[in-house]
């Protein structure tokens, strides 16, 4: 059994159960001659059990025959950090003094466990440091150990 020839990849962040033919999904898939309605239906079915509106990074593989497959990744670390810190957006200032909220080290560890499949490490301590770095760049103070 031979594999299909890959035409290209499309990277999008799509809200759970919120795939519609509207931009950015429609134009991105239309350029590659992919059946937009079929993708939207398949994606919405695959994300049915998830909380509505969670941003999901998705990699769509488009094949030469215009068929497709897709892989849904875990939500961005910033989504989890904002949720744990109970804020709607990160700091707009570039200075480290602009703290907009706080998260605990335990929160960062929990987020790291959730994000483990998408991080480039298998070590939980390193993953936690990655999440703490994301928190700092968003203007969140990490308290605890």
UniProtKB/Swiss-Prot annotation:
Gene3D superfamilies: Ribosomal protein L11, C-terminal domain (1.10.10.250), Ribosomal protein L11/L12, N-terminal domain (3.30.1550.10). InterPro entries: Ribosomal_uL11, Ribosomal_uL11_bac-typ, Ribosomal_uL11_C, Ribosomal_uL11_C_sf, Ribosomal_uL11_CS, Ribosomal_uL11_N, Ribosomal_uL11_N_sf. It comes from Rickettsia massiliae (strain Mtu5). GO terms for biological process: translation. One or more lysine residues are methylated. Belongs to the universal ribosomal protein uL11 family. One of its GO terms (molecular function) is large ribosomal subunit rRNA binding. It holds the Pfam family Ribosomal_L11_N. Part of the ribosomal stalk of the 50S ribosomal subunit. Interacts with L10 and the large rRNA to form the base of the stalk. L10 forms an elongated spine to which L12 dimers bind in a sequential fashion forming a multimeric L10(L12)X complex. This is Large ribosomal subunit protein uL11. PANTHER family: 60S RIBOSOMAL PROTEIN L12, LARGE RIBOSOMAL SUBUNIT PROTEIN UL11M. Keywords: Methylation, Ribonucleoprotein, Ribosomal protein, RNA-binding, rRNA-binding. Forms part of the ribosomal stalk which helps the ribosome interact with GTP-bound translation factors. One of its GO terms (cellular component) is cytosolic large ribosomal subunit.
């Amino acid at each position: 059994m031979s594999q299909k020839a890959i035409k290209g990849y499309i990277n999008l962040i799509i809200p759970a159960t919120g795939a519609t033919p509207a931009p950015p999904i429609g134009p991105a898939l239309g350029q590659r001659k992919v059946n937009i309605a079929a993708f939207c239906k398949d994606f919405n079915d695959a994300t049915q059990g998830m909380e509505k509106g969670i941003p999901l990074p998705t990699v769509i593989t488009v094949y030469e025959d215009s068929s497709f497959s897709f892989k849904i990744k875990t939500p961005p670390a910033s989504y989890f950090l904002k949720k744990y810190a109970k804020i709607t957006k990160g700091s707009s200032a570039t200075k480290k003094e602009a703290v907009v909220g706080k998260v605990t080290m335990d929160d960062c560890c929990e987020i790291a466990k959730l994000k483990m499949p998408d991080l480039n490490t298998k070590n939980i301590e390193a993953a936690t440091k990655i999440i703490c770095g994301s928190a700092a760049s968003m203007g969140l103070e990490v308290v605890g150990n």
